[in-house]
Amino acid sequence: MLGLRPSLLLALAGLFFLGSAVSQECTKYKVSSCRDCIQSGPGCSWCQKLNFTGPGEPDSLRCDTRAQLLLKGCPADDIMDPRSIANPEFDQRGQRKQLSPQKVTLYLRPGQAAAFNVTFRRAKGYPIDLYYLMDLSYSMLDDLNNVKKLGGDLLQALNEITESGRIGFGSFVDKTVLPFVNTHPEKLRNPCPNKEKACQPPFAFRHVLKLTDNSNQFQTEVGKQLISGNLDAPEGGLDAIMQVAACPEEIGWRNVTRLLVFATDDGFHFAGDGKLGAILTPNDGRCHLEDNMYKRSNEFDYPSVGQLAHKLSESNIQPIFAVTKKMVKTYEKLTEIIPKSAVGELSDDSSNVVQLIKNAYYKLSSRVFLDHSTLPDTLKVTYDSFCSNGASSIGKSRGDCDGVQINNPVTFQVKVMASECIQEQSFVIRALGFTDTVTVQVRPQCECQCRDQSREQSLCGGKGVMECGICRCESGYIGKNCECQTQGRSSQELERNCRKDNSSIVCSGLGDCICGQCVCHTSDVPNKEIFGQYCECDNVNCERYNSQVCGGSDRGSCNCGKCSCKPGYEGSACQCQRSTTGCLNARLVECSGRGHCQCNRCICDEGYQPPMCEDCPSCGSHCRDNHTSCAECLKFDKGPFEKNCSVQCAGMTLQTIPLKKKPCKERDSEGCWITYTLQQKDGRNIYNIHVEDSLECVKGPNVAAIVGGTVVGVVLIGVLLLVIWKALTHLTDLREYRRFEKEKLKSQWNNDNPLFKSATTTVMNPKFAES
């Protein structure tokens, strides 16, 4: 049952792949030929039937999905729909190959993937090259002694796996600059802590033995090796691995399975660590062996892990990290980045290295990674893996199957898709760690293989050839059937007459420019008509009412973006019935004379409010200056408007009967209070006004009394301030005089000269004073 499962999954994946290709849509843009059509998308097809498009219809209607073209009446034989194709080529010479087919030719249509199957069958006894790369720092002394004894055992273990095995040897320590090694001359000669111990000077990498099938030679060359030493714990192992991968001729790699055993008891330096030793140049990934020594290690930084992973994959080398127990987790993290690599726990003295290599090889050879060489961005490759153990994965960036047994095939479905028309190119698919490859030749599928109809004389008016259903006109002729003669005018000059307002779009993108005039397309939308000098108009792009253009055919019609309403209707979408009954006030005046009626509703002038435009809340009080002046001239024949009252106050009618409105009380031109009442009538600035008969005039103030009182007050305040100042100065002088009198009474005078000094000096004998 499990044996059938991969094939069943493969069939289902193929059906899904075909189904997804059929269900695609066609999104076209500026399509004028079959080539343009098939590049528009994988779902687009082209109809080459003659006269498939009618008058005014663009050639772009020939481009659509196959289903739509069939519905439009295009015969199936006239539909051009080139598909992406994969043509595998199998080796017929009977050579033993682990990958098949050996070559595949793809014809790729943009956006449509081509799929093909790659089968891997693991062969028994495939040749192996094994290179043993050993850390010779002082802590590996016991390991070196054991490896010297295991040369024959290593080659014998290879012969148990394969009929053709070879083995080589190399060693490494670290860069020979501080802080990686002690640069004292004595320490450079003998870096070991025990001076009596024979040690060789430190080095970055030494290629000791080229790959060979002679176990005695291996044992002899390894037996000559001496231990060395360095300062810090991490070693320069990545430098050594890079040289092993970058120097295939010096190492002696064959085009077979390549294994690299990396034996160490510590970590590793990587890119950036070289700066500690003033080494700033990045590692270039090239071979720099001179006399089997990496002599330029102090010029280049350590490689990065990613750089090393790429180089190992490029060189098809599978590393086996034989490390001590404390380093297993560190190198397991490294194998997550480096494909087709394994980790084995090395005993403290490397006595188990033979079994470790055998176990790691079986683990590596039973897992297959299918990958490809570097591709441009326009190509995308995905893998569907169908493994013999029942596991599967879909749409991954590389194929992956584990537990692959000898002679038990596993199948990968490879899908290749181009995002655009590409140039012819090729790439290689290979199983990592194995030598077999699949060469994939990619060719573009961007042309239509239409029937040749150019021999028919009646087509294209004899002035062109028919290609895929459309005319390709001779020089000097243009048009759908080459009916227009340019008469020396360029197509740019003719098209200039078809561009509105010097636009870059010909005929608004909705027509063809034929002999300098726009011939509008027939729209795909039912009942839609495109018209106008530049095909800029139609009969559907107008405002809608009740979800219908211009309210429906019974209300109006659309004409180039504006509704033309039928009698009895109005509005931008013919949404209104033509009537004014809803706009009449109680006096049957439309909008009170302060607005206009639209859609049977008042549109009021600024400052007035619906429904009848009677109120003006933003106008403020009616008691304004011009109304007060009108009341003054109409009632009392005076004021600013006295001479032209009939003109300035034409909208006001003086009433003798009081009005029931809020009165206004304002000052007139003479300062008297005048009281009047206003009643607004229909229209703007039309009022009835009633003015009270009497004026309230208030007597003015006594100016002389105010001025005289002010002057007297100022004088009195000045006199008072002078009196206060005089009193203060008198009190100050009196206080000073009394203080002077008091000081004079205290002073006492004598007749001694204070500068006189006596000439007599008396000295007392202290002994005499005691007696």
From Swiss-Prot:
Residues carrying Pyrrolidone carboxylic acid: Q24
Disulfide bridges in this chain: C26-C44, C34-C448, C37-C63, C47-C74, C192-C199, C247-C287, C387-C401, C421-C446, C450-C468, C460-C471, C473-C482, C484-C515, C498-C513, C507-C518, C520-C535, C537-C560, C542-C558, C550-C563, C565-C574, C576-C599, C583-C597, C591-C602, C604-C613, C616-C619, C623-C664, C630-C649, C633-C645, C672-C697
Top-level division of the source organism's lineage: Eukaryota
Modified residues (Phosphoserine): S747, S758
Molecular function in Gene Ontology: amyloid-beta binding; complement component C3b binding; metal ion binding
Positions of the VWFA domain: 125-364
One GO BP annotation of this record: integrin-mediated signaling pathway
Residue sites binding Mg(2+) per the record: S137, S139, E235
Every PSI domain range: 25-75
Record keywords, A-Z: Calcium, Cell adhesion, Cell membrane, Disulfide bond, EGF-like domain, Glycoprotein, Integrin, Magnesium, Membrane, Metal-binding, Phagocytosis, Phosphoprotein, Pyrrolidone carboxylic acid, Receptor, Repeat, Signal, Transmembrane, Transmembrane helix
UniProt topology in membrane: Single-pass type I membrane protein
Post-translational events: Both Ser-747 and Ser-758 become phosphorylated when T-cells are exposed to phorbol esters. Phosphorylation on Thr-760 (but not on Ser-758) allows interaction with 14-3-3 proteins.
Record SUPFAM superfamilies: EGF/Laminin, Integrin beta tail domain, Integrin domains, Plexin repeat, vWA-like
Gene Ontology CC entries for this record: cell surface; external side of plasma membrane; integrin alphaM-beta2 complex; integrin alphaX-beta2 complex; membrane; membrane raft; receptor complex
Record's signal peptide: 1-23
InterPro entries the UniProt entry points to: Integrin_b-2_sf, Integrin_beta_N, Integrin_bsu, Integrin_bsu_cyt_dom, Integrin_bsu_tail, Integrin_bsu_tail_dom_sf, Integrin_bsu_VWA, Integrin_dom_sf
Sequence ranges on the Extracellular membrane side: 24-702
Family of the protein in this entry: Belongs to the integrin beta chain family.
Record text about domains: The VWFA domain (or beta I domain) contains three cation-binding sites: the ligand-associated metal ion-binding site (LIMBS or SyMBS), the metal ion-dependent adhesion site (MIDAS), and the adjacent MIDAS site (ADMIDAS). This domain is also part of the ligand-binding site.
Assembly, per entry: Heterodimer of an alpha and a beta subunit. The ITGB2 beta subunit associates with the ITGAL, ITGAM, ITGAX or ITGAD alpha subunits. Found in a complex with CD177 and ITGAM/CD11b. Interacts with FGR. Interacts with COPS5 and RANBP9. Interacts with FLNA (via filamin repeats 4, 9, 12, 17, 19, 21, and 23). Interacts with THBD.
Full protein name: Integrin beta-2
Gene: Itgb2
